[in-house]
Amino acid sequence: MKRNFPKLIALSLIFSLSVTPIANAESNSNIKAKDKKHVQVNVEDKSVPTDVRNLAQKDYLSYVTSLDKIYNKEKASYTLGEPFKIYKFNKKSDGNYYFPVLNTEGNIDYIVTISPKITKYSSSSSKYTINVSPFLSKVLNQYKDQQITILTNSKGYYVVTQNHKAKLVLKTPRLEDKKLKKTESIPTGNNVTQLKQKASVTMPTSQFKSNNYTYNEQYINKLENFKIRETQGNNGWCAGYTMSALLNATYNTNKYHAEAVMRFLHPNLQGQRFQFTGLTPREMIYFGQTQGRSPQLLNRMTTYNEVDNLTKNNKGIAVLGSRVESRNGMHAGHAMAVVGNAKLDNGQEVIIIWNPWDNGFMTQDAKNNVIPVSNGDHYRWYSSIYGY
């Protein structure tokens, strides 16, 4: 289960964030006066279907609120920014549509990702699926009022500014300083210049929406002690990170670490053979058994009710995913952890997932077995190991 990014993915946009009053805003007695403003977001926006916009507008606040409650945040108000796309170096979009979610301070807290249904693999009956996570929010907040291109490869995420210099803004924990110096100066070729699209100011939602009602109505169920203690670097240890996070949560401890788990299971591997090794489901079950658990393999995605019951009983679930885009090479398979589940105020059932690559959680439609991840790929949730 090794991680593999496409060589480079580019996000081309101009981000200009400012809070300004708007005329003719709808009145809402539940929203404070300072919330009746909007944030202008400059993005590259082409051919976004009306259905996508409507879905984002209708459901974003419910999904955002579920994560707020998972993070134990207070009630807040948000507005939905205009959509942008992520482009690969062949200048084609990755197929998803992204919407920034802005707070009343003008900062991005979350990114809404809307993906067209992948008919061959998806169990969802909907034309589009919606997921919410922090994703690139911190990176975008660092580059207000600048035209940037964001690139990513196996070493992390780069921002290329208007002076064509690349800066590594999200590095992998295992990246050595020597390698870091070499990668900071790339890429600077014509491909980067050509990917910079001209953009104009676009209007986000006309007013902020308070999540007060949504917050009170939602049902949230979470592994009580689940925390993100470490994230996956330039290695193939996704299963190690997943099991460590689950066991730390269910035992309420900090003693499990991915590298130690991998060393326990593969004691004779050295160098890159160790760095890029993965685990089989059998090895994952065996490790759980050595730690006093009785993990069970389920050859499908867990249902919402199963997640609800297992989480209530303090039993962790590992997601086993198969990459839709390519079944070959590094990270054709990937492991993730189930944090919990939520029933939104609109009745939608979602599963909360942690991808070891990320510093935050993401929402997943409980009826959709295809998970979009932060590098633009999609993983089919084909099996589960529960009982950690």
UniProtKB/Swiss-Prot annotation:
InterPro entries reported in the protein's UniProt record: Cystatin_sf, Papain-like_cys_pep_sf, Pept_his_AS, Peptidase_C47, Staphopain_pro, Staphopain_pro_sf
GO biological process, one term: proteolysis
Reactions it catalyzes: Broad endopeptidase action on proteins including elastin, but rather limited hydrolysis of small-molecule substrates. Assays are conveniently made with hemoglobin, casein or Z-Phe-Arg-NHMec as substrate
Subcellular location: Secreted
Residue ranges the record assigns to the propeptide: 26-214
This protein's UniProt keywords: Hydrolase, Protease, Secreted, Signal, Thiol protease, Virulence, Zymogen
A GO CC annotation given for this chain: extracellular region
PROSITE patterns reported in the protein's UniProt record: THIOL_PROTEASE_HIS
Coiled coil feature spans: none
Entry-linked SUPFAM superfamilies: Cystatin/monellin, Cysteine proteinases
PTM remark: Cleavage leads to the activation of ScpA probably by an auto-catalytic manner.
EC number(s) on file: 3.4.22.48
Regulation: Prematurely activated/folded staphopain A is inhibited by staphostatin A (ScpB), which is probably required to protect staphylococcal cytoplasmic proteins from degradation by ScpA.
First and last residue of the signal peptide: 1-25
Miscellaneous remark of the record: The catalytic maturation of ScpA appears to reside outside the cascade of activation started by the metalloprotease aureolysin (aur).
Reported function: Cysteine protease that plays an important role in the inhibition of host innate immune response. Cleaves host elastins found in connective tissues, pulmonary surfactant protein A in the lungs, and the chemokine receptor CXCR2 on leukocytes. Proteolytic cleavage of surfactant protein A impairs bacterial phagocytosis by neutrophils while CXCR2 degradation blocks neutrophil activation and chemotaxis. Additionally, promotes vascular leakage by activating the plasma kallikerin/kinin system, resulting in hypotension.
Subunit annotation: In the cytoplasm, prematurely activated/folded ScpA forms a stable non-covalent complex with ScpB.
Annotated family: Belongs to the peptidase C47 family.
Protein name: Staphopain A
Organism, scientific name: Staphylococcus aureus (strain Mu50 / ATCC 700699)
Lineage of source species: Bacteria, Bacillati, Bacillota, Bacilli, Bacillales
